[in-house]
From Swiss-Prot:
Gene3D superfamilies: 3.30.230.10, Histidine kinase-like ATPase, C-terminal domain, MutL, C-terminal domain, dimerisation subdomain, MutL, C-terminal domain, regulatory subdomain
Name of the protein in its database record: DNA mismatch repair protein MutL
Function: This protein is involved in the repair of mismatches in DNA. It is required for dam-dependent methyl-directed DNA mismatch repair. May act as a 'molecular matchmaker', a protein that promotes the formation of a stable complex between two or more DNA-binding proteins in an ATP-dependent manner without itself being part of a final effector complex.
GO cellular component, one term: mismatch repair complex
Keywords: DNA damage, DNA repair
Length: 598
């Protein structure tokens, strides 16, 4: 009889092979154990390390615990409480699900598992080591929760133990694992010790609000990161991106401040990292790494988490959509951040409190493909806002000394006029004798008009504001390609209630919901004339102050075109005269040219 060349591996050997994928180093053990504690509902986790984890890794939690009858199963390969069917795997939200971590860890160490559930009057302890798959169960003393001790890691695989680094290096890897997990779980306290000394202690925060989350971010990434970062809140359908993106000034050679998460799971995903790097491409030097903390939440059916042994990567079913969504969200946050950067000359901007609001901007989303990547200038502290109000400039321009007959004429740039027999400025035949005739641009800040025998200067900025006010009155609405999400604090929410009716009447379509104690707005559509504006900045300015006239507020705070060619200025005047000739008259500043025309 021919002997079989293919045979089934013994369970002990199979576990050790699996351990080669799951247990790379002590930090891998810590990651698996912490994730199990989180899945068990723990809100306090203590991790004790000795000699970099090679001698001892002890984790204690106050989770739901493991019942006596399940202790042996917990150490058996492919035994789990997380899933039961293939459909469960496709909808998985827990951090663990394969049921092989404890079996793999126990196959290369001496493992003790002590646990108690709330329904048990006493705790029970399970012990196993190495290739011996026998599990010893005995009574123990323990509060509700679980303690796992992993001693003498790789004691039975000398080749693996030989590749461990120094205690300091291995502990640094453990420290980084705890940091990454703690960032995603601010409502859970973590204590990390090494050789009996407390190294890290992250206290839990009260809730998941942005203000509370910032406490955990500051504890892990430092206050300097928070000072240089902008909170991002970006949502479209089932996709939700939130977190913090730093200013380009915080870019660094190493990626030690780059954190990304998918459905609460620590990730080092290529698609996410590429999208973020592309968003920063024009803002930071080549080779530098941006600093960011980003959380991506989406329907679990839209990704496959079972593609990496350590679950560091996922496979998105619509990778291009995810990439474009993240790219645009980060780009808009950066654009809003640069727009809000104060300058020494900026004196007329509205002060805003540094609070828990979003930093996304839908100017691109309003009318462009979300996969398009529109380049924008490298970071600069300068803005396009004038240092003086337009009215001051125009007043200085036309002001002449009453005691002097103005020996110097105003500087005027105009299209050449037809030469006449007399030196006086004459007008061409105007079919609308009571309409204004545009003669020239005045220093790119105003239009010189002639109406009958009178001359006027009209500020371009005021004209643009009037045009926006008239457009708002038309109440034409345009849907946004990707809705804009805003998170409001209590004061901002009260202002939103105050302005809600006026905003909806002017063409906004806004949905409101309450989430984790915060008011969240989803901007679905906006007035057509505001579609190119920084909506995030505009609305938050509105919710941070009081105004009686929304149209006037938007006109004064929108970024409007103030540089026109002469034909463009002519069309602007013609449009406004047809709609609001009386309001236009209020903007005209009379200019007396009689001294030059006689």
């Amino acid at each position: 009889m021919t002997q079989h060349l293919i045979h089934i591996l013994p369970p002990q050997l199979a576990n050790q092979i699996a351990a080669g994928e799951v247990v790379e180093r002590p930090a891998s053990v810590v990651k698996e154990l912490v994730e199990n504690s989180l899945d068990a509902g723990a809100n306090h986790i203590q991790i004790d390390i000795e000699k970099g984890g090679a001698q001892l890794i002890r984790l204690r939690d106050n989770g739901c615990g493991i019942a006596k009858q399940d202790l042996t199963l917990a150490l058996t390969r492919h035994a789990t409480s997380k899933i039961a069917t293939l459909a469960d795997l496709e909808m998985i939200l827990s951090l663990g699900f394969r049921g092989e971590a404890l079996a793999s860890i126990s196959s290369v160490s001496r493992l003790t598992l002590t646990s108690r559930t709330a329904n048990q009057t006493e705790a029970w302890q399970a012990y196993t080591q190495g290739r011996e798959m026998n599990v010893e169960i005995q009574p123990a003393s323990h509060p509700v929760g679980t303690t796992i001790e992993v001693a003498n890691l790789f004691f039975n695989t000398p080749a693996r133990r030989k590749f461990l680094r120094t205690d300091k290096t291995e502990f640094n890897h453990i420290d980084e694992v705890v940091r990454r997990i703690a960032l995603a779980k601010p409502t859970i306290s973590f204590t990390l010790t090494h050789n009996g000394k407390i190294i890290r202690q992250y206290r839990k925060v009260a809730d998941q609000s942005v203000a509370q989350q910032q406490k955990r971010v500051a504890a892990i990434c430092g206050n300097h990161f928070l000072q240089q970062a902008t909170h991002i809140e970006w949502q479209h359908g089932d996709l939700h991106l939130y977190g913090w993106v730093s200013s380009p000034q915080l870019a660094r050679p190493q990626n030690d401040l780059s954190y990304s998460y998918v459905n609460g799971r620590v990730m080092r995903d290529k698609i996410i990292n590429h999208a973020v790097r592309q968003a920063y491409a024009e803002l930071i030097p080549t080779g530098d790494q941006p600093a960011f903390i980003l959380f991506l939440d989406l329907n679990p059916t839209e990704l496959d988490v079972n593609v990496h042994p350590a679950k560091h990567e996922v496979r998105f079913h619509q990778a291009r959509l995810i990439h474009g969504f993240i790219l645009q969200g980060v780009q808009n946050a950066l654009q809003a951040q640069l727009a809000l950067t104060p300058t020494d000359n900026q004196t007329d901007s509205v002060a805003e409190t540094k609070a828990c609001y979003t930093a996304d901007n839908n100017r691109a989303a309003a009318g462009s493909n979300i996969f398009s990547s529109t380049p924008y200038p490298r970071y600069s502290g300068a803005t396009n806002r004038p240092t003086k109000t337009a009215q001051q400039c125009y007043a200085e321009l036309i002001n002449t000394d009453k005691n002097d007959n103005a020996n110097v004429a105003p500087i005027i740039y105009a299209e050449p006029l037809t030469t006449q027999a007399t030196p006086a400025i004459t007008e061409t035949a105007d079919p609308y004798p009571h309409h204004s005739q545009v003669l020239a641009l005045v220093e790119n800040k105003a239009l010189l008009l002639k109406e009958q025998e009178h001359f006027y200067v009209v500020p371009l900025k005021k004209l643009a504001q009037l045009q926006l006010t008239l457009s708002l009155a038309e109440k034409k609405s345009q849907p946004l390609l990707i809705p804009l999400s805003l998170s409001l604090d209590q004061a901002q929410a009260e202002r939103w209630q105050q302005y809600q009716a006026q905003l909806l009447d002017s063409g906004f379509e806004i949905k409101q919901k309450h989430w984790q104690g915060q008011t969240r707005l989803s901007i679905i559509a906006v007035p057509q004339c505001l579609r190119q504006q920084n909506l995030q900045q505009l609305l938050l300015q509105l919710f941070n102050q009081h105004t009686d006239d929304l149209a006037d507020f938007f006109a004064k705070n929108s970024e409007l075109m103030t540089t026109y060619s002469l034909p463009e200025g002519t069309r602007l005047i013609a449009n406004i005269e047809q709609q609001a000739k009386t309001q236009l008259a209020d903007l005209k500043l009379a200019v007396d040219f009689s001294a030059y025309l006689t």
